[in-house]
């Protein structure tokens, strides 16, 4: 039934907006991860709705693998500047490779995706962020299905689900 689907989506949207507002109020230096892809565009749209008509109270940050289509980067820059009026921080995996912080993979299945973690952790430290918001669909990967709204990480960016605190969002 379309009404039930719409009501469910409205509930999910309201919950997401509530959590984004909570992050902005409870953390001193939050950042929203933003690549220009569909997940991050959805997150940015929810953030815009959360603070409309004001501006976002936190910057957006892209950890760039430099393996994106040029049109994606152009759209990223346009969307952040023109649609959101937000501050965009870009840090490059290539810079991490050039500085010797990470080693680029080789071979036919080489990817820079796993190298993003070091660049992200370096940027979090550089800007002293105390919360990084990102969007991921739980149905894409089993590990993501275990994640909660807040996934507390250690200094290496690792998440241990056994140490995860309970989240009782709808018990109040």
Where are the language model's segments positioned?
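Nucleotide-activated chemistry modules centered on ATP-dependent adenylation/adenylyltransferase
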Residues: 1-172
């Amino acid at each position: 039934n379309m009404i039930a689907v719409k009501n469910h989506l409205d509930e999910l949207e309201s919950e997401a907006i509530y959590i984004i507002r909570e992050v902005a109020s409870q953390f001193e230096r939050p950042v929203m991860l933003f690549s220009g892809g569909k997940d991050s565009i959805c997150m940015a749209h929810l953030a815009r709705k959360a603070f409309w008509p004001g501006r976002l109270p936190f910057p957006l940050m892209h950890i760039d693998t430099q393996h994106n289509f040029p049109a994606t980067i152009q759209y990223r820059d346009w969307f952040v500047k023109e649609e959101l009026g937000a501050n965009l921080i870009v840090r490059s995996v290539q810079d991490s490779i050039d500085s010797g912080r990470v080693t680029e993979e080789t071979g036919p299945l080489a990817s820079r995706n796993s190298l993003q973690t070091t660049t992200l952790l370096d940027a979090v430290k550089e800007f002293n962020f105390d919360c990084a918001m990102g969007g991921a669909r739980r149905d894409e990967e089993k590990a993501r299905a275990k994640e909660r709204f807040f996934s507390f990480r250690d200094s290496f960016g690792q998440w241990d689900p056994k140490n995860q605190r309970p989240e009782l969002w709808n018990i109040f």
